[in-house]
Every structure is written in C-alpha cells, then in structure tokens.
Curated annotation (Swiss-Prot):
This is Ion-translocating oxidoreductase complex subunit E. Belongs to the NqrDE/RnfAE family. It is a multi-pass membrane protein. It comes from Buchnera aphidicola subsp. Acyrthosiphon pisum (strain 5A). The chain crosses the membrane at residues 34-56, 68-88, 91-111, 127-147, 181-201. The lineage of its organism: Bacteria, Pseudomonadati, Pseudomonadota, Gammaproteobacteria, Enterobacterales. The keyword Glycosyltransferase does not apply. HAMAP family: RsxE_RnfE. Keywords: Cell inner membrane, Cell membrane, Electron transport, Membrane, Translocase, Transmembrane, Transmembrane helix, Transport. Part of a membrane-bound complex that couples electron transfer with translocation of ions across the membrane. The complex is composed of six subunits: RnfA, RnfB, RnfC, RnfD, RnfE and RnfG.
Length: 227
C-alpha cells in the first residue's frame, strides 16, 4: 500500500466533504463555529473508525444480501454508545450538537465507507481508512466553521470549554470587531456560500498543480529531444 497515495486520496483528492459532497446537512448546520465543527468532526471520525474496524472484522460472516441492515445495526449501536459517553463526560458539547449526534447513523460517508472499504478490506486498512476519511471531513468542517465564526461573530474558538472542560468559557480569540461582522455567515446560506468558496479554492489548487505538472513534463521531453 502506497502511504502517500492513501493519505492524499482520503484527505485531499477524494475529500468526503469537498469532493464527494457527502454528509452536507451536518456540515452546513453545525459549523457555525470552530468548536462545534471540531466536536462533530471528532465524533464522526470516531464512529467511522470503530464501525469500519468492526465490519471488517466480521466481513467474512456477514451475508452479502443482508449487509446493509447489518451495517445500520452496527453503526447505530456505535453512535448510541458514543452519544451516551458525550452526555456523561462532555455535556456542553452534547447539548450543542443535539440531534446531529444520532443523525450520524444516516451519514452517507459512514455507510459508504463500510460497503466500499470495510466489507472488502483488511482490518488495518479499514481502521486507517476510517481515521483519515474522518479527519479529511473534520478539516473541511473546521475550515467552514472557523470562517463562519470569524465573519459572523468576530471570534475564534469561542466555547472551547465544550471540548476541554478545564478551560474557562472566556478563553477565545477576538479577531474582528462586531461592527465589521457579517451576520449572514452564521446562517445556513452563509455556510453554503463559504463551503462553495472552499471547494472553488481546492479546484483552483488542483488545476494549478495539474498545469504545472504537465508543463514540467513537456519541458523535460523537449530537453531530452534536444540532447
């Protein structure tokens, strides 16, 4: 397994949020600030990793015709367990994420990776696939959430105590004066526009890199012909 290609495919080239556009409902609804984005991203990554590992472990005994209902049972069990842990140990984050924790069960990313990778691959590959697909989605959520929080509220990492309980609620960065904030950014249309902007930036970077690669190949070919 080529590690570089493995990471590039999951974190950048086939990013589940910026390329495949899966699970957009929680991405747009819960990324009103950076902390919510991190919380939801970490939860989704944990669910992906655990479910991928479990499904891969039992892939040889899961009947092909019944695999989807079995996926859903495993995913819902894992999500319920994690929801109970969040309720017990990070109650503020649990309250903030609300209904979007149980809705992780229906997230297309998790079901898709279970069927595409976990059901057909080794436990180790499935485990790392879950981690890096989740991290790729979390990075996209964090980027959207950070931009929305800065533009909409002028702050960054407001409410960090939701994730790290021993941090005081007043610990955050103020980057923009309230009179310069754009309230649209914290609403779903603003999130949609910011997500589209990030997708456009990614596509521009990919296109620029592709053109440079082609240009370098052509220059090398010309140099070889001259020689």
């Amino acid at each position: 397994m080529n590690i570089k290609n493995f990471l590039n495919n999951r974190l950048w080239k086939n990013n589940s949020s910026l390329v495949q556009l899966l699970g957009l409902c929680p991405v747009l609804a819960m990324t009103t600030n950076a902390i919510n984005a991190i919380g939801l991203g970490m939860t989704t990554t944990l669910v992906l990793t655990i479910t991928n590992t479990i499904i891969s472990s039992f892939r040889k005994i899961i009947p092909k015709d019944l695999r989807i209902p079995i996926y859903m049972m495993i995913i819902s069990s894992v999500v319920t367990s994690i929801e109970m842990l969040l309720h017990a140990y990070t109650f503020n984050l649990y309250q903030s994420l609300g209904i979007f924790i149980p809705l992780i069960v229906t997230n297309c990313i998790i079901v898709g990776r279970a069927d595409l990778i976990a059901y057909k691959s080794s436990i180790v590959e499935s485990f790392f696939d879950g981690i890096f697909i989740g991290l790729g989605s979390m990075f996209a959520m964090f980027a959207v959430g950070s931009i929305r929080e800065i533009l909409g509220n002028g702050t960054l990492f407001f409410g960090a105590n939701k994730i790290i309980s021993n941090i005081h609620s007043s610990v955050f960065f103020t980057l923009l004066d309230k009179k310069f904030t754009i309230i649209l950014a914290v609403f779903p249309p603003g999130g949609f526009l910011i997500l589209g902007f990030l997708i456009a930036i990614k596509n521009f970077i990919d296109l620029y890199y592709k053109k440079n690669t082609i240009k370098n190949i052509e220059q090398c070919s010309c140099s070889n012909k001259i020689k």
